[in-house]
Design a protein with these regions (language model features):
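Conserved D-loop-proximal element of ABC-family nucleotide-binding domains
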Residues: 27, 52-53, 65-73
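Short, contiguous acidic/charged loop-to-helix segments that flank catalytic cores in large enzymes
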Residues: 29-34, 65-67, 120-123
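Short loop/turn elements that form and flank the Walker-type P-loop nucleotide-binding site
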Residues: 10-12, 52-54, 83-85
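SMC-family hinge/dimerization module
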Residues: 1-38
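C-terminal lobe/lid and adjacent interdomain/linker elements of RecA-like ASCE P-loop ATPase modules
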Residues: 70-158
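GG-anchored amphipathic helix commonly corresponding to the ABC/SMC/Rad50 NBD signature/C-loop
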Residues: 15-16, 20-22, 36-58
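Internal helix-turn-beta structural module
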Residues: 15-16, 32, 40-44, 128-138
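Walker B catalytic acidic pair
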Residues: 61-62
Length: 158
């Protein structure tokens, strides 16, 4: 569509229209997509533009919302790919995505004296393995640690 108003950077404004299901009419992406879907659409665009885009830092907030399995692996692969040209910050709850990160941080909230505070801790490699194990099944045991280690080693090998 065409905007007739002028903005600080001109009068061009872009809207993406997509059909998310066979037989459905195209609708404006910003009106029908969830936050996770918007992040994945941005990832797709940034992947295509990775070699020409000068944006130094890309932030993806919960890009893994509503996905798992092969879709999560594909997102992890694309994040890893664009991280070669950009600094990527990604908030994730999926082991597949956490496993490909060069650095992992654990963010936690606590209540002290009726005040909520947030803390962040950079994880060392063993802590990364343990956290990937925890988010993969809710517990840390021999099986989940082996799985987490396999995911991390797959990342290191690629």
């Amino acid at each position: 569509y065409i905007e007739e108003e002028y903005y600080e950077n001109g009068k061009d404004k872009v809207a993406f229209f997509i059909s998310t299901n066979v037989g459905e009419d195209e609708k404006e992406l910003s009106k029908i997509a969830s936050g996770g879907e918007m992040s994945r659409m941005m990832l797709a665009i940034k992947t295509v533009l990775a070699n020409t885009d000068n944006t130094p830092i890309l932030i993806f907030d919960e890009i893994d919302t509503g996905i798992s399995g092969k879709a999560a692996n594909a997102v992890a692969e694309k994040l890893n790919q664009i991280s070669g040209k950009h600094q990527v910050l990604c908030i994730s709850h999926l082991p597949n995505i956490a496993a490909v990160a060069d650095f992992n941080y654990f963010i936690s909230k606590s209540v002290v004296n009726d005040r909520t505070s947030t803390s962040i801790k950079q994880l060392n490699e063993q802590e990364i393995i343990n956290e990937i194990a925890r988010i993969s099944s809710g517990e840390v045991n021999e099986v989940t640690i082996k799985y987490a280690d396999k995911l991390r080693n797959k990342k290191i090998a690629s």
